[in-house]
Amino acid sequence: MADGLNMGSLTLNDSQHAPAPGGPPSGGRAAYIPPHLRQRQVNANGDGASAPPPGPTGGSWGGPRGPRGGNWANANAPDFNPRGPNGNTNTNSGWTATEAGRPLFNPNAYGNPGHGGGYAGASARGSGDGQWRDGKHIPGPPNPRLERELFGVPNDPTKQNTGINFANYDDIPVEASGHDVPEPVNTFTNPPLDDHLISNIALARYQTPTPVQKYSIPIVMNGRDLMACAQTGSGKTGGFLFPILSQAYQNGPAAPPPSAAGQFGRQRKAYPTSLILAPTRELVSQIFDEARKFAYRSWVRPCVVYGGADIGSQLRQIERGCDLLVATPGRLVDLIERGRISLVNIKYLILDEADRMLDMGFEPQIRRIVEGEDMPNVNDRQTLMFSATFPRDIQMLARDFLKDYVFLSVGRVGSTSENITQKVEYVEDHDKRSVLLDILHTHGTTGLTLIFVETKRMADALSEFLINQRFPATAIHGDRTQRERERALEMFRSGRYPILVATAVAARGLDIPNVTHVINYDLPTDIDDYVHRIGRTGRAGNTGIATAFFNRGNRGVVRDLIDLLKEAHQEVPSFLESIAREGSGYGGRGGRGGRGRGANATRDMRRMGGGMGGPPSYGGGSGFGAPASNYGGGYGGAPSYGGAGYGGGYGGGGYGNPSGSTGPSSWW
């Protein structure tokens, strides 16, 4: 029966079959010989090297059909030669040969097919990517599908557009301190920006730079370090992406370090030129999405790495090439230890939400990344720090990372936007759910509502309560998996679940368009956290409402809350004034751990007395509890936290306690 089997006009006895090497002639029954033994039998019979069956393009097993002639199954195949049969490398790989036989980086091949990581051959980058050729940036062809994914369509509710109060940004005061501060720009034009970046900015429908962008673009383009303190929602991400991408398009890729030579195939170790550090998974993902927008059709490859997600997929992304890396500190340290990322080529270091990273305990990892690895020193890189608040001690720590920097203070920094209408309601804990339902019924679900709670358990419980009350709600917090968090945020952004209950994990830096109402169901213990929470609405000139539930359990922030409301020209309820008068021990200006806003939380410390030489010393003098004009003790010498100030028992008038460490208003 087998003899009669016919497969597509071929039979087992088909005379068209090639005879087995050394076997009977055509037409007889041939004995089956496994492929890996056929060549051996040919050579044993002295018949020479007949052509093996054709293999896949690339020549991995079937003969010299691929560009490298690889044929590991052929005993007579030539030895593998990474420089090709003539001793030259494939120019598509980004390498050229020297007389000494060492390959050199060929920047003109950057972005060609088979050019991975900027240095070694890999898969083509795709139809939407550009190239660097003959010293020029060659943008890739348009990709309509990717364009819709990145930029949306006009009036897309999931994409942020400037709001009705955007023109009022011109009235926001800006203070830039430092010597030779460049003049601000007022439009997205060339110069100083690259034409390709300007076209991507137009695709994003951005028409006018925000105040922070007007100043940060020329500052960074002139090679200066920057510490930028800007009103939340004011375009800080564009403030650092625009200038570093523009310079990348104008200057091209950097040559790899000598240690990168010899890495063929996919690049195992990435050598990014720009590093952006941020505290949370959500924020780095958001920055990465923005980088993809403005790197569209360019040679620059953005990558993102963060904890809580599959490291394998992140490694594969890095292997395909990584020019701009967005990372959380913990995952970056992990990849450095694995030998998969080198910082030796870094030209730009950006710390976003820098104060939050230090508050969250990332200082050891940040110092290791900046000072303990192979990153160029402070004089050989540009360092940019962006945040909505820069308390005094954070500025002192940042001094170690910056050189000759410009301090940029835009608007009422560390404060709130007047685009946000703030309301404070006195609500006891047991009444919060009923008051919340009243608010939701009153305002409806026409916009997005973000509700902040303090604990993960409360986030789950409150979202379940709202669902039972027929309100479409979801929740995110630190115990949710990364996939669950991303799905919840996507459902919230799209409006399918217009109510999101969140812990502080979503408070900082997340840019969620069209959030019209923020409710602080549980007030935070730090006024800076309150600022960042309500900053999720009123972004990019849009207006929003922020409601806070306050009771005597929150009296620790009452004075800072009153000052903040007055600063933003908001109504101050009488019960806040009454509670503030009840005791002077609460509401001390220190905030959490001495990092409170105070009168100078957003001023350039170089313009205050005490000097800036040497590591910080917080001892001596009057301490942090003294009037703002008495920051005695200087900032020279080894770190010291003793004396009558910070950490020295909070003696005397320390830490906002007029009665000393043993008085009736003592913190202890």
From Swiss-Prot:
ATP binds at residues 230-237. GO terms for molecular function: ATP binding; ATP hydrolysis activity; eukaryotic initiation factor 4G binding; G-quadruplex DNA binding; G-quadruplex RNA binding; mRNA binding; RNA helicase activity; RNA strand annealing activity. Keywords: ATP-binding, Cytoplasm, Helicase, Hydrolase, Initiation factor, Nucleotide-binding, Protein biosynthesis, RNA-binding. SUPFAM superfamilies: P-loop containing nucleoside triphosphate hydrolases (SSF52540). Residues 1-96, 112-144, 581-603 are annotated as: Disordered. A motif (DEAD box) lies at residues 352-355. The keyword Transferase does not apply. One of its GO terms (biological process) is spliceosomal complex disassembly. It catalyses: ATP + H2O = ADP + phosphate + H(+). Its EC number is 3.6.4.13. Residues 57-69, 584-597 have a biased composition (Gly residues). This is ATP-dependent RNA helicase ded1. It comes from Emericella nidulans (strain FGSC A4 / ATCC 38163 / CBS 112.46 / NRRL 194 / M139). The lineage of its organism: Eukaryota, Fungi, Dikarya, Ascomycota, Pezizomycotina. The gene is ded1.
